[in-house]
Each structure stands twice: as structure tokens, then as C-alpha cells.
């Protein structure tokens, strides 16, 4: 039992710095070497060795000592020695010009595993064999963890990877979109797998509300709206946009013919899909793409079809969508011209789950006085968009709550933005916005006091 405690203690101490890096990214991550270089001109330790990591590991060691029944001084000193070993490894790697953050078996694990036994061996009266076995097991476990963190979470999955490489983002991508993780989906996405698909759905069935709720969900329609925009170029007066989002189409396939019935009657200038193809936020996405292709065939748009990704979507969907003729805007913009005048569509990545929306990057190549239509899956970056000078903000995600209560409104909006912009028109400064209730449903296939919609929006100068 003692050997298991020691092994867990060492693993947890060394797991603390990358765990904090996972959740905090670059916050409080001041380099231990202050960016200084050794006399060979190479970094002393490198940017990945931080005061945050050192202090947190030593603090964790002290707390773990109390938890495991070790003397406090043992926890403190063993953790400090382990971090000292880690710094020795980093210093050695820098001298041989080994890049920071890359895996180097044995060198990465040995010193941080062995140095703590300066105090652990005499205090616990461990034999040479016991200490050697513990060091070996520590190195093996630490190496496996390092491979997962550095070679999977911190390795770009493809040459065209468009997002800033962060461990938290990669973990979300892998756990939501990789088939290799399919057996772990219910554990990682517990809220959706159990709460929505089991508990909430069961509630609606027991109360007898499920049938009527599903009927409401299938009762979608088209809403025709006008918006007056003083800065709209004259050539684009009466521009018509078809905007639809939140299909979640593999969860309610009966919607496909109704969507097609509506869309085949429309001849918009621009068609925009606002994200969320898949019903679940994890698992297979081939079905929703196949169903989506049947919908896209019905769309006739003068200036093309554009899309942004939602929190239920995967980067792997982009090539398939582009093969359908859709231009996916991922922190990017596109210029639309007519008779010498132009407008810009500015689309950002998902701001809700993946938290990868970058308004500054998306609008970086646009003239400051240009007319800009901002496309985002959710209303959550409304303040950044207004500060960037957007004229019109189009989004979805909230489903207008999907389930509303009389005189109260949405039970949940699943958005960090104010409830006042959860559906319909809204305004911030000179920017006008519209939040769609979406077409499909999420979680449970019901709606109450809300209706799925396809928006036909006409822009008036």
C-alpha cells in the first residue's frame, strides 16, 4: 500500500503543472528563467518551465502528503526535488538544442522520478530494489502521460489545422469527433449522454408531453424580416439573405422534406448556414452530412452559400461541406462585389464550446469603412463584434430556449450572452443583430412555446 501511495504521489505532483496549463492556458505562466539565455546562447530552461508550474507542484505535494498521511515536510521536499529534477532535464535538453515541449524518453522522466527518493528512501526505509522499481514505474507512467499530452493533445492533427494549438481545444476536438474515443463518449459528455438523452427525455415521456413537443418541433416555418441599415451600399439595397442554423438533422430526420419544401421556393442573393449540423455534440457525423447534402441541393443562391461552425460541429466536416459548394468561414472573411460596390461577410469559429472565435483575425483584411455582416454560431461575441465595427450580426445557437414557460420565457439559453438577445432582433451601439431560433432541436426532440425557423432577411438602406 505504501508503494502505491508513493507512486500516486509522484504522478500527481508531476501532473499538476500540465493540468493547470490545460485549464489556464498562458495565464500566470511566467517563465522561471525570465526568458534569459545561457552562455551558449540557448534558452536557460525554455518557456514551458514556469513559476506557476513550480509553485503549484510544490503546493500539491504538500496537500497530497496530508491526504496520504505523509509528514508535511516529506511532501514539500519530495515535490521540490521532483521539480528540481524536471528543471535539470530541461536545462540538459536546451544544451543539446532539443526543442521545448518535445518528448525525450528517460531524460524527461528520470531526474524528476529519482531525486525525490533522496528523502523518500530513508524516511520510509525503502530498500534499493523497492526504490528502483518505484522509479521505473514512475518513469513508465510519466512517459505514457507525456506521450498523450505532447504527441496527441499538443500535436497539430493536419497541415491545414486552422486553430491556435491548445491542449484544451485538442482534447475537446478528439473527445467530440475522434472515433477512437467512442467508448469514452458517455463519460466525457456525461451531461448530454445521461441528463438529456435519458433523464429529460424520460421526463417528457412520463408526463405525456413528448408527443406534442415533437409535433411542435416538426412545425417549422419561414419568417420574413426587414432590417434597415444606413451604411448599406446602394447596390445592395433589397439584398435578400436566407439564414438557417441549428439543424441537428440526424436527430430529427423528418425535418428534411419540410426544410426542402421551404427552401426550394426561395431564391436568395446569399444563403448562410449558422452551424450545428449534428444532433449530439460527439460521435458519428456522417449521417448529418449526408442529410445536409440533400438540403443543399435545393438551394439556389446568387452569391453562393456560406457557413460557420457550431459547437456540435467538427473541423473534419469542412472538406465535405466545401465539396458541396459551401464556403466555410473560420475566422475569415469574404468580399462580395456588385457594380463597383462591396460588402463583407465576416465569419468566426465557434465561441461557445471550442472557444475559438477570433473577431480580430476574421476582420484583419477588411477596410475600416467597409459594410460588414458578422456571422457567428452564437450571440456570445456580440461586444467584440460591435467594437470591430460590424453592421449586422447573424447567429443562432439558443433555439430561443427551445422550451419556454409562459410569462417567464426560456428555461435555458445555453449561452453566456444576455437573455435579451436570445431570440429575434436586438441592437448594440450602431450594430444590429438577429438571433434565430434555429431549425431543429438539441438534446430532446421537443419544443414548447417556440418554433423552428428559417429566416428570410431583406436588407434595406
Whereabouts are the PLM-identified features?
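Core catalytic region of metal-dependent phosphoesterases/phosphodiesterases
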Residues: 253-338
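Beta-strand-turn-beta hairpins that frame and shape the catalytic cleft
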Residues: 220, 229-242, 334-347, 367, ...
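Active-site neighborhood of phospho(di)ester-bond hydrolases with catalytic His/Asp-centered motifs
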Residues: 242-245, 270-276, 303-311, 329-331, ...
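Binuclear metal-dependent hydrolase catalytic cores centered on His/Asp/Glu-rich metal-binding motifs
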Residues: 323-324, 339-376, 382-383, 444-448
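Acidic, His/Gly-rich catalytic cores of divalent-metal-dependent hydrolytic chemistry
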Residues: 142-191, 201-222, 430-431, 435-461
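Conserved beta-sheet core of the metallophosphoesterase superfamily
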Residues: 379-455
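Interhelical loop and helix-boundary elements at the membrane-water interface
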Residues: 1-65, 69-73, 83-118, 128-132, ...
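N-terminal active-site segment of His-dependent metallophosphoesterases
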Residues: 196-286
Amino acid at each position: 500500500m505504501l508503494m502505491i501511495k508513493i507512486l500516486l504521489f509522484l504522478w500527481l505532483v508531476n501532473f499538476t503543472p500540465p493540468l493547470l496549463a490545460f485549464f489556464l492556458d498562458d495565464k500566470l505562466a511566467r517563465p522561471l528563467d525570465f526568458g534569459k539565455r545561457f552562455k551558449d546562447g540557448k534558452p536557460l530552461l525554455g518557456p514551458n518551465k514556469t513559476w506557476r508550474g513550480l509553485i503549484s507542484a510544490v503546493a500539491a505535494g504538500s496537500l497530497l502528503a496530508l491526504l496520504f498521511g505523509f509528514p508535511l515536510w516529506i511532501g514539500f521536499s519530495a515535490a521540490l526535488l521532483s521539480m528540481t529534477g524536471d528543471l535539470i532535464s530541461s536545462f540538459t535538453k536546451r544544451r543539446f538544442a532539443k526543442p521545448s515541449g518535445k518528448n525525450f524518453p528517460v531524460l524527461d522522466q528520470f531526474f524528476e522520478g529519482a531525486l525525490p527518493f533522496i528523502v523518500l528512501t530513508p524516511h520510509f526505509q525503502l530498500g534499493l530494489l523497492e526504490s528502483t522499481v518505484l522509479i521505473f514505474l514512475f518513469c513508465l507512467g510519466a512517459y505514457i502521460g507525456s506521450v498523450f499530452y505532447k504527441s496527441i493533445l499538443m500535436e497539430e492533427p493536419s497541415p491545414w489545422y486552422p486553430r491556435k494549438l491548445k491542449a484544451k481545444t485538442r482534447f475537446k476536438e478528439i473527445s467530440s469527433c475522434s472515433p477512437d474515443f467512442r467508448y469514452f463518449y458517455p463519460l466525457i459528455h456525461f451531461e448530454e449522454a445521461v441528463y438529456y438523452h435519458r433523464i429529460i427525455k424520460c421526463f417528457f415521456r412520463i408526463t405525456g408531453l413528448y408527443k406534442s413537443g415533437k409535433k411542435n418541433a416538426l412545425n417549422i416555418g419561414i419568417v420574413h424580416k426587414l432590417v434597415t441599415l444606413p451604411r448599406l451600399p446602394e447596390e445592395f439595397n433589397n439584398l435578400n439573405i436566407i439564414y438557417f442554423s441549428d439543424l441537428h438533422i440526424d436527430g430529427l430526420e423528418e425535418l428534411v422534406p419540410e426544410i426542402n419544401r421551404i427552401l426550394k421556393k426561395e431564391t436568395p442573393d446569399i444563403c448562410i448556414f449558422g452551424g450545428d449540423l449534428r444532433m449530439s455534440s460527439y460521435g458519428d457525423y456522417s449521417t448529418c452530412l449526408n442529410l445536409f447534402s440533400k438540403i443543399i441541393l435545393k438551394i439556389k443562391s446568387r452569391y453562393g452559400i456560406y457557413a460557420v461552425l457550431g459547437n456540435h460541429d467538427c473541423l473534419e466536416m469542412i472538406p465535405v461541406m466545401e465539396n458541396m459548394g459551401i464556403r466555410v468561414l473560420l475566422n475569415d472573411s469574404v468580399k462580395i462585389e456588385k457594380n463597383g460596390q462591396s460588402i463583407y461577410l465576416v465569419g468566426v469559429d465557434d465561441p461557445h464550446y471550442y472557444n475559438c472565435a477570433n473577431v480580430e483575425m476574421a476582420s484583419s483584411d477588411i477596410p475600416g469603412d467597409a459594410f460588414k455582416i458578422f456571422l457567428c454560431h452564437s450571440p456570445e461575441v456580440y461586444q467584440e463584434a460591435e467594437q470591430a465595427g460590424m453592421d449586422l450580426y447573424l447567429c443562432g445557437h439558443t433555439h430561443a430556449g427551445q422550451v419556454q414557460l409562459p410569462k417567464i420565457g426560456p428555461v435555458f439559453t445555453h449561452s453566456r450572452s444576455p437573455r435579451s438577445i436570445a431570440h429575434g432582433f436586438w441592437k448594440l451601439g450602431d450594430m444590429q443583430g438577429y438571433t434565430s431560433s434555429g431549425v431543429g432541436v438539441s438534446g430532446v426532440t421537443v419544443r414548447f412555446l417556440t418554433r423552428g425557423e428559417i429566416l428570410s432577411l431583406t436588407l434595406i438602406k
